[in-house]
């Protein structure tokens, strides 16, 4: 019976990719794919212009060919880690070349690393279809509203990072059996540290989060996938396992042998001892660098889970997790930031009048309701970083967009506004979004005025007040797989209506306004 339960977990370890990925590093079309992905990945994309060199983003293939040529010429460096201080494959001391080439290599390598993961999504003709136990953002909103109001405690978790670079390479080794590709990744990670003078006693992934976003996502997601894989396994086997048994999974080497040994240990020793650790009302939700672990159990039980997580990261990934990154809080008097909202469970007292024969009496009842508030100050801070307003919330023009056509400028501002309104549609109080909408509307007007070398007042008088109607009109009707949407954010509509729109496929960059620190 235990072997059947472990079969699903062994499938991940049994996956092996024998195809060689390393030759793809020298293919120009890989960098073209990475470049095209960058064009469509964000509405904040700004065309790259290479100042002083005469290149734009359409002719950057010349630089790609130069990069490939230099990597061919110094291919031996990948197998000789001792010489990368003296001989860099970039071949230039210019800071631009260093940053530009490092970004190209990281983006291209990220495309290559995605191949083994994408192949797992292609169904085989001989494979029996299986239902995947997956939960997307579509189900998180109803979960928060339906489940959290009935739970007692929450662990507010900042997933620990940075993680050592060598551990990341070992994690990817479970998925990629192409040794040259792993050597190249190790070489590039160390070389990137040298370019930026970022060598520290604890080399970490954090330095890649801003300058090499796509590679950072691949490395970070592989790390999170690894810890969640083992964590879910131990969670479902918690009826048999001790909380400290995660030390058996210190490395994925000889995973089959450890699993077979563990089955006998679980069956013979832990079947009746550890029943007190089983928590059937535990819920785990992760969103990027944060996670919540909610439970209906007692404070002692949730404290055990905190100790369990600290030991888990320490023994399984050789990572010392600071205990203060995991907070235990009761739902009754705690508000936590998650999924772009400030969430809390409100206790609403109410009195019910009852009549029994000729006697009347009042019964006081307490009801719990999950409430979400839009955090305006972090949103304004995000707009400030994106150069739409000052830190105090005063709208300013967007000079980089002043070269676009009027319709493109209005479309970009309108798209940001619609995405934010769409994402925060489930908030119980939407009045705060009017301020965000006002900032974007006036920033759009000032950008247009900057383009036409005029003032906002003269621009509106000349083009008409209906120029920016899009910011106050109803969102267009969109066919939804769940239900048909009505007015999303009308000017005079109800601001207390709570509707979770479940057709969100990608969260706008402005929804991620808190750093992972």
UniProtKB/Swiss-Prot annotation:
Family: Belongs to the intron maturase 2 family. MatK subfamily.
Entry keywords, A to Z: Chloroplast, mRNA processing, Plastid, RNA-binding, tRNA processing
Compartments where found: Plastid, Chloroplast
Transmembrane annotation, as ranges: none
Protein name: Maturase K
Function of the molecule: Usually encoded in the trnK tRNA gene intron. Probably assists in splicing its own and other chloroplast group II introns.
The organism of origin for this protein: Paris tetraphylla
One biological process term in Gene Ontology: tRNA processing
Gene Ontology cellular component annotations, sorted alphabetically: chloroplast
Keyword presence, Chloroplast: yes
Keyword Transcription regulation on entry: no
GO molecular function annotations of the record: RNA binding
Main location as per UniProt: plastid
Superkingdom, taxonomy of origin: Eukaryota
């Amino acid at each position: 019976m235990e072997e059947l339960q472990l079969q699903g977990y062994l499938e991940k370890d049994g996956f092996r990719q024998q195809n060689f990925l390393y030759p793809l590093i020298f293919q120009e079309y890989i960098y073209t794919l990475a470049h095209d992905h960058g064009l469509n990945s964000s509405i904040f994309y700004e065309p790259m212009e290479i100042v002083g060199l005469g290149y734009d983003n359409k002719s950057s293939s010349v630089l790609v060919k130069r990069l490939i040529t230099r990597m061919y010429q110094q291919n031996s460096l990948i197998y000789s880690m001792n010489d990368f201080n003296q001989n860099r494959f970039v071949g230039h001391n210019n800071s631009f070349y260093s940053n530009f080439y490092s970004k190209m290599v990281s983006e291209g390598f990220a495309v290559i690393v995605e191949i083994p993961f994408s192949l797992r999504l292609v169904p085989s003709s001989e494979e029996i279809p299986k239902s995947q136990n997956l939960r997307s953002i579509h189900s998180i909103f109803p979960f928060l509203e339906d489940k959290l109001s009935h739970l007692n405690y929450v662990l507010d978790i900042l997933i620990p990072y940075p993680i050592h670079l060598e551990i990341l390479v070992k994690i990817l080794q479970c998925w990629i059996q192409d040794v040259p590709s792993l050597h190249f990744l190790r070489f590039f990670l160390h070389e990137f540290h040298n370019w930026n003078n970022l060598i520290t006693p604890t080399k970490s992934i954090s330095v890649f989060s801003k300058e090499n976003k796509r590679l950072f996502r691949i490395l970070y997601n592989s790390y999170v996938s690894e810890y969640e894989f083992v964590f879910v396994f131990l969670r479902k086997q918690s009826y048999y396992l001790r909380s400290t048994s995660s030390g058996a999974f210190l490395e994925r080497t000889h995973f089959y042998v450890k699993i077979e040994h563990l089955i006998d240990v679980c069956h013979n020793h832990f079947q009746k001892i550890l029943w007190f650790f089983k928590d059937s009302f535990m819920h785990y939700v992760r969103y990027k660098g944060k996670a919540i672990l909610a439970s209906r159990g007692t404070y002692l039980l949730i404290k055990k889970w905190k100790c369990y997580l600290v030991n888990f990261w320490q023994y399984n990934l050789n990572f010392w997790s600071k205990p203060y990154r995991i907070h235990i809080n009761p739902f009754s008097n705690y508000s936590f930031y998650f999924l772009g909202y400030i969430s809390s469970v409100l206790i609403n007292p109410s009195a019910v009048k009852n009549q029994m024969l000729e006697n009347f009496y009042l019964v006081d009842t307490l009801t719990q309701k999950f409430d979400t508030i839009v955090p305006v100050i972090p949103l304004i801070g995000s707009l400030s970083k994106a150069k739409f307003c000052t830190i105090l919330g005063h709208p300013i023009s967007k000079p980089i967009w002043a070269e676009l056509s009027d319709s493109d400028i209005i479309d970009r501002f309108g798209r940001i506004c619609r995405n934010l309104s769409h994402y925060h549609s489930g908030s119980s109080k939407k009045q705060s979004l009017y301020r965000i909408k006002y900032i974007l509307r006036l920033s759009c007007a000032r950008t247009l005025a900057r383009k036409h070398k005029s003032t906002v007042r003269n621009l509106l008088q000349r083009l008409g007040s209906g120029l920016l109607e899009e910011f106050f009109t109803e969102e267009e009707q969109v066919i939804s797989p769940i239900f048909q949407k009505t007015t999303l954010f009308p000017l005079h509509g109800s601001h207390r209506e709570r509707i979770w729109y479940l057709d969100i496929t990608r969260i706008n960059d402005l929804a991620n306004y808190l750093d992972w620190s």
